[in-house]
């Protein structure tokens, strides 16, 4: 018996479906041309994102935070620095009881290799630590003359996330401790190239100037037309205290001989005011003693009356009659007014009866 062929279900061969006609091809040519123009307009109006032509290699991350007890101006300064530095990270305030070397562990947890730490003391003194975590070096500064962005209200402006230029005073290359600070400031304040949060623009410049043994920080906008500079802010002055070999500690590499602590400065001011007060009191005591001293009578000098001309003597008149009293017109008018008022009241009372 020959093997029978199995028939397909239904006994009919399955035919392939014809491809549907494209909807765009089905439209008339005029309508098709209008849709193409709309697509071109949408593509023209769309703003493309920043094109990254390289790889992000410099993985510098900066941790910016502070201790407890800072005032509003320090908090605003921290926010301004975080806004100007897209490669920065934030953290909660650190307790005063914790030691400074704990910050290295915080940087490790946050995956940061640089740190800007603001330390407040006595609710009036502000110190800034710039550190390369965890191996160092680190520098401690006293922050003075703080002016934030909201406080200055300058006319300059820059794009958020743009990369800055760094301008340093020529004095940074003259002394070794300034050269070390220059390298530390470059690694902290320069935004890495091709950073994900940065923009591929350079429209502002950070300037670090040395004057009066202090570092003055300024932020300027670069105007495209004539390359002029317009200040943006913030402003602050860094007074160097010490440079340490390690991160937040270790052997001292440099100590500023011109530095004067805020406590000593306030003490000098108090001593000057106290000296002025003591001087005033001594002057008053001397004046009192001079007043108590007996006055020395000088002998009469006959030459003092040479140019004195005696005045004519007036005859003395004796008044035997008592002068007439002066008439007070105001009192007289007042008495007449009272008399007339009483008479009017009597007449009115008589009419009523």
Swiss-Prot record:
InterPro entries, per database record: Brix, BRX1
MF-aspect GO terms: RNA binding; rRNA binding
Protein origin, superkingdom: Eukaryota
PROSITE patterns: BRIX
Disordered: annotated segments: 1-46
Modified residues (N6-acetyllysine): 276
Biased composition range(s): Basic residues: 1-10
Gene Ontology CC annotation, any one: chromosome
Record has Transcription as a keyword: no
Coiled coil spans: none
Keyword line: Acetylation, Isopeptide bond, Nucleus, Phosphoprotein, Ribosome biogenesis, Ubl conjugation
Main location per the UniProt record: nucleus
Location in the cell: Nucleus, Nucleolus
Brix domain ranges (all copies): 60-249
GO biological process assignments: ribosomal large subunit assembly; rRNA processing
Compositionally biased residues, Basic and acidic residues: 21-36
Cross-link (Glycyl lysine isopeptide (Lys-Gly) (interchain with G-Cter in SUMO2)): 160, 314, 322
Chain positions with Phosphoserine modification: 261
Task performed by this protein: Required for biogenesis of the 60S ribosomal subunit.
Entry similarity comment: Belongs to the BRX1 family.
Name of the molecule in the record: Ribosome biogenesis protein BRX1 homolog
């Amino acid at each position: 018996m020959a093997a029978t062929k199995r028939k397909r279900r239904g006994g009919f061969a399955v035919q392939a479906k014809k491809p549907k006609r494209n909807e765009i091809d089905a439209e008339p040519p005029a309508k098709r041309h209008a849709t193409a123009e709309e697509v071109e307009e949408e593509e023209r109006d769309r703003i493309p994102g920043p094109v990254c032509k390289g790889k992000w290699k410099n993985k510098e991350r900066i941790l910016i935070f502070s201790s407890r007890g800072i005032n509003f101006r320090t908090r605003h300064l921290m926010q301004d620095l975080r806004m100007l530095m897209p490669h920065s990270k934030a953290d909660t305030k650190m307790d005063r009881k914790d030691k400074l070397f704990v910050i290295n562990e915080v940087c490790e947890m946050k995956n940061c290799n640089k740190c800007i730490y603001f330390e407040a003391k006595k609710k009036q003194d502000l110190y800034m630590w710039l550190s390369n975590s965890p191996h160092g070096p680190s520098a401690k500064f006293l922050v003075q003359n703080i002016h934030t962005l909201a406080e200055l209200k300058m006319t300059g402006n820059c794009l958020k996330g743009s990369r800055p230029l760094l301008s340093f005073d020529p004095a940074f290359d003259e002394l070794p401790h300034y050269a070390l600070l220059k390298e530390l400031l470059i690694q902290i304040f320069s935004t890495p190239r091709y950073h994900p949060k940065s923009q591929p623009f350079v429209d502002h410049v950070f300037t670090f100037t040395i004057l009066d043994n202090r570092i003055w920080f300024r932020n300027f906008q670069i105007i495209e037309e004539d390359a002029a500079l317009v200040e943006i802010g913030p402003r602050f002055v860094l007074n160097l205290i010490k440079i340490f070999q390690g991160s937040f500690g270790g052997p001292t590499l440099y100590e500023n001989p011109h530095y004067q602590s805020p406590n000593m400065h306030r003490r000098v001011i108090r001593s000057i005011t106290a000296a002025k007060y003591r001087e005033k009191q001594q002057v008053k005591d001397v004046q009192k003693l001079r007043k108590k001293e007996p006055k020395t009578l000088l002998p009469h000098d006959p030459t003092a009356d040479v140019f004195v001309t005696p005045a004519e003597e007036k005859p003395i008149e004796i008044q035997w009659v008592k002068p007439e009293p002066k008439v007070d017109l105001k009192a007289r008018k007042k008495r007449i007014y009272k008399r007339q008022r009483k008479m009017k009241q009597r007449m009115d009372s008589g009419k009523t009866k």
